Amino acid sequence: SASRESSVSTPATPDRSTMGSGASSMAEHYAEHAKYGTIAEAKEKLGADTVSKYVKENRYNELLPSPAGAKYTMCVVEFNVPGAKNGGTDKGPNGHRIDSIPIANGVVKAGGACEIIKYYHDKHDEFAKAVEKYDALIVRINPGQLSQGTTEGTQQRFDDLMNSLIAKGKPVWSSPGVQTKMGAKDALVKIANMKCGLVDTFAYYDAEALGTMFKKTMAFQPRVIKQNRGSAGEGIWLCWLEGKDYCKTFGEASLDDTDKLKLMEMNDNHVEYHTVKEFLTFCNDGPDAPGAGKWESTFPGKYLEGGKEAGGQLVDQRFLPRISEGEVRVLMSGDVVQMIIHKKPEGGLSAVGGNSAYTYFKPGCEEYKLLEESLKADIPKLLDAMNLSGEPLPLLWTADFIPKDAEDGTPGVTEYVVGEFNCSCVGVSKFQAVCGGEKTLADVPDEDYYDACKLTDLMGVQAIKMIKAAKGE
């Protein structure tokens, strides 16, 4: 269905116990004079939750018209996979991602102009000319989609174009550099000495480095080996030494090929037992290679295939036993925390997919106050650490944290370290529930719609803020 005809209203008897009279009168003022920009201004000044008590916002299932004379213009960029139903599993019957319209509308509500445009691999030059007029681009293309049904080199041509816009001072979210550097597992090595990092983190890009170093780290303590590719716990292995004691200090011992390991893959928590040589062979050459042994994992291994340039890498970190308490996901828009989510595993140690229960917390909550403060202290240094100086933070990204005891041994203190960044076309979960098939944005329940729009509206405000910063305003 099209946009709902709706009005702005206020409760008959506002609950003034939750806010001062000045705040309530200001909220009521915005309610009476509701325009896209003033609603965004109200949220920025009073907070989204406060404004929602007094302002019943419209629901829009279609793209809003951009305000006349908007100072900043943006576009949401999509790609439809040739021959795929709806243009891909992330699209609805109208050919759009379910979250594209709310993201574009978030920009409009914040006072900017925004359109949704498509990238066609056979109309690259036409697209390149069209995007010159925009102040910034919000790219909503899933990783790997540009290699489906397209001519060879499409991804590189698209990335080169995005980088050329960045060189002209135009933000692109998320840029190719941010996706490949911040989104890669070896980002954990680059933040190892920051508050959110784990000091004994190593990256391997070839078989020799993997074999030499892993035998030393594994001889000292339980480890976690993470592949760069894959998702939902695939290729993330918890590793324990089986039938042999760990050495007392790092570097004093190195394992033999015949030493035995207990391994748990995080995608489904299944356990396997292999020799060191079998595990290294699996990581390098796959389960069918000579000397790999017999594997229950249904995935192909070969984690270093293609080398560093192709994303072939493994990261080696200390195993943190408190992962059994679950992971903490921080959902961000630029430098602003939008939500904190505790993912508690239901059986096993993995908090992926349907194996976990979710509890949601608002920014500033007491439970994760120290985590939030620590993250905010690191954010200004984050992109520099990854050789991304001058790039804007992703417009939508997540950081998954694992709890641990204090590094200095202080009893009763919990610290958190990043296990993964995600900044490649992060989906908006409340919209994704109706993703694909014949359902559209109109099929999202009201409660989920308004909750998800808190995020997309924040993205609009943040996008304009980052454009201003890029222009030096």
Label every model-predicted segment.
Residues K43-P65:
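Repeat-associated, polar segments at repeat-unit boundaries in modular proteins
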Residues A70-M74:
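Nucleotide donor/acceptor-binding cores
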Residues F79-K85, T89-M218, S231:
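Conserved N-proximal alpha/beta basic substrate-recognition cap immediately N-terminal to
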Residues I138-R140, V224, V315:
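Structural motif
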Residues E234, L238-S389, I402-P411:
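Phosphate-binding site of ATP-dependent enzymes
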